[in-house]
């Protein structure tokens, strides 16, 4: 069975002209939004994002954070992803709210990637609020 890791390794030097942006590239964005870094607005290419992540890593209980760092390290020098930028990276987690999102820009696409809740108490509360509150505070943040 092939994994996202296999895809990223196989296509790392393949341009988007040869193989268009697709669902597996979207999955890369869905993983990178779990990077344990402070929020930032300006666009960063993957090399800059990696350096930023190394210097600004936040403490986290997310099991996805180490995998996101590993995958970012793997793709930061690839030809395929050399021109994409990550911007409007939002990472909010406190006693009342948990929210994460970023914008991924390619030459032709703009993709918004959202982080899901984790197994922490605030993650459970966020999920519970979906049953009785609309829109939730985090849904408002997403707009």
Tell me the role of every PLM-derived stretch.
Residues 1-143:
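Non-catalytic, mobile gating and regulatory segments of ester bond hydrolases
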